[in-house]
Swiss-Prot record:
Start-end of Basic and acidic residues biased regions: 211-224
Topology class, membrane: Single-pass type III membrane protein
UniProt protein name: Synaptotagmin-14
Residues in the Extracellular compartment per record: 1-24
All residue ranges annotated as the C2 domain in the record: 260-379, 415-550
Length: 555
């Protein structure tokens, strides 16, 4: 039997063979295709991984400066190579002087008008710097003009601390700044005659006392090598005698330091007879950019510490330099106990349909207050997780937190990762509220940059079965993130002693699996005695929120 098909015929046994071979051929070709696709995906993954590993951090902000210096170094090396062999006995200063003469001739031939900043930089490369000189100030006051609606003000001084007495006025009416003997040689105290705000000129000192002023927040560490510091380099006495009088010292380029969290223009007026304190918030400058805050509306909150019963807040203003000019009154501020009072300033970014976000805060202790007359000064805000704003009289690990957004840090565990949790249980509604307030000392073990963290909450029953779970939003690039997110779980009163609440902190990574930073558990299977005491205090608080710091356990 044969089937006719065109010019040739096929037997039945040939068709049977073809039908048996076709599925195998199709399977083989399919396997080859899948293998090729997998190899292609693996190649793309490896290529993307190496691409991300080879990319550095931020671009070098001083690339133009480095290019300029490299070209000058090349010119210097070529100039030194052209010298005769007999000129090797010349001193280094003479060779360097010839190099600068040749460099100046080259610049004059190309650019007739040389910038004064480049001249001062070329002069400074020949000098030898020393840490401190008593004849020159480390800061220079210059008037700076921002945008059209910005306030013209003088160079901001470093924030006052307890070791620096407040400014006063003598009988003649001329303002002064009182300096203690320990400050002589470290700072020059003077007053600006064209402004009502005092200013102090500081020099960098290698002593231990100056480390507090030189310490910067982690946001500025990446720019220390590229941006010149806000201090004028001075010559040592040996170089001063060699170079001549101090009148020939040029002023180098001294840029305005960039404030990261805002600066408040505040006026304090204290009346000791009436025990009344008037605080006027004029304006806010040096506000972070829109990319960091995500908004353009601002509001300032004030609270009198440590009682926290007298509060005030400004109206909402828009723009990069909002102007408030609002005065607030705080009563019952005794002059005998004024050292125990402080005013906390907080700058909030107000977003439409969103929760307010803290931009920066500062606690101003009234020990620095002028008890007679008005005192105007800038208040430089700091990150809200800065432990320097803690009140020593308040212990969050022993008492419940009335203000869940308190900025105090628990320092009892050192650099161990910690988390601040607020618990509240309403027996009437059967709702368990857990507020994740903030974290501390979160580290990225895989890299040196700050981690991108979020907190996961899981509620388990007595059998270890999951009843509910939720998580916070991700805080990117913050070792001390502020969450302030509340989660509600439905738990009956008879079940409250049989449930376990687990909080896990994770570091979210783009190309890799998430990494657990630490965890704690509260309730039936508490991870420690501190967690068990927190859970017991919540049940006995009768509807009041209880906040405690907890050290995270390693995974």
């Amino acid at each position: 039997m044969a089937i006719e098909g065109g010019e040739r015929t096929c037997g039945v046994h040939e068709l049977i063979c073809i039908r048996k071979v076709s599925p195998e051929a199709v399977g083989f070709l399919s396997a080859v295709g899948v293998f090729i696709v997998l190899m292609l995906l693996l190649f793309l993954y490896i290529n993307k991984k190496f691409c991300f590993e080879n990319v550095g951090g931020f671009p070098d902000l001083g690339s133009g400066y480095n290019t300029r210096t490299n070209s000058q170094d090349k010119m210097y090396n070529s100039y030194m190579d052209r010298d005769e062999p007999g000129s090797s006995s010349e001193s280094e200063d003479e060779a360097l002087g010839k190099y600068h003469e040749a460099l100046s001739r080259t610049h004059n031939s190309r650019w007739p008008l040389v910038d004064s900043r480049q001249k001062s930089y070329a002069w400074e490369t020949r000098q030898k710097y020393s840490p401190l000189s008593a004849e020159y100030d480390g800061y220079s006051t210059e008037a700076s003009m921002e945008d059209g609606n910005c306030i013209q003000r003088m160079r901001r001084t470093p924030p006052l601390d307890e070791l620096q007495p407040p400014p006063y006025q003598d009988d003649s009416g001329s303002p002064h700044l009182s300096c203690t003997p320990s400050e002589i040689g470290d700072a020059k105290c003077e007053i600006s005659h064209c402004s009502n705000s005092p200013r102090c000129s500081f020099n960098k000192c290698p002593s231990e006392g100056s480390t507090g002023h030189e310490a910067e927040s982690y946001h500025n560490k990446g720019y220390e090598d590229d941006v010149p510091s806000d201090s004028t380099a001075v010559l040592s006495p040996e170089d001063m005698s060699a170079q001549g009088s101090s009148s020939q010292l040029p002023k180098p380029f001294d840029p305005e330091p960039e404030a990261k969290y805002g600066t408040l223009d505040v006026t304090f007026d204290y009346d000791s007879e009436r025990q009344k304190l008037l605080v006027t918030v004029t304006a806010v400058t040096d506000i972070p950019t829109y990319n960091r805050t995500g908004g353009n509306s601002w509001q300032v909150h004030l609270v009198l510490l440590p009682i926290k019963k007298q509060r005030a807040k400004t109206s909402i203003q828009r723009g990069p330099c909002p102007v408030f000019t609002e005065t607030f009154k705080f009563n019952h501020v005794e002059s005998e106990m004024i050292g125990n009072y402080a005013v906390r300033f907080r700058l909030y970014g107000v977003h439409r349909m969103k929760k307010e976000k803290i931009v920066g805060e500062k606690i101003f202790y009234l020990t620095k207050l002028n008890l007679q007359g008005k005192m105007s000064l800038p208040v430089i805000l700091e990150p809200s997780y800065n432990p320097s704003g803690c009140d020593s009289q308040v212990s969050l690990s022993e008492a419940s937190c009335g203000d869940s957004t308190s900025s105090c840090q628990s320092l009892q565990h050192g650099s161990v990762p910690e988390i601040l949790i607020g618990l509240l249980y309403n027996a009437t509604t059967g709702r368990l509220s857990a507020e994740v307030i903030k974290g501390s000392h979160f580290k990225n073990l895989a890299a040196n940059r700050p981690p991108n963290t979020y907190v996961k909450l899981t509620l388990l029953n007595s059998m270890g079965q999951e009843m509910s779970k939720c998580k916070t939003s991700t805080r990117r690039g913050q070792p001390n993130p502020v969450y302030k997110e509340t989660f509600v779980f439905q738990v009956a009163l008879f079940q409250l002693s049989d449930v376990t609440l687990i909080l896990s902190v994770y570091n979210r990574r783009s190309m890799k699996r998430k990494e657990m930073i630490g965890w704690i558990s509260l309730g039936l299977n508490s991870s420690g005695e501190e967690e068990l005491r927190h859970w017991t205090a919540m049940k006995e608080s009768k509807g009041q929120q209880v906040c405690r710091w907890h050290a995270l356990l390693e995974s």
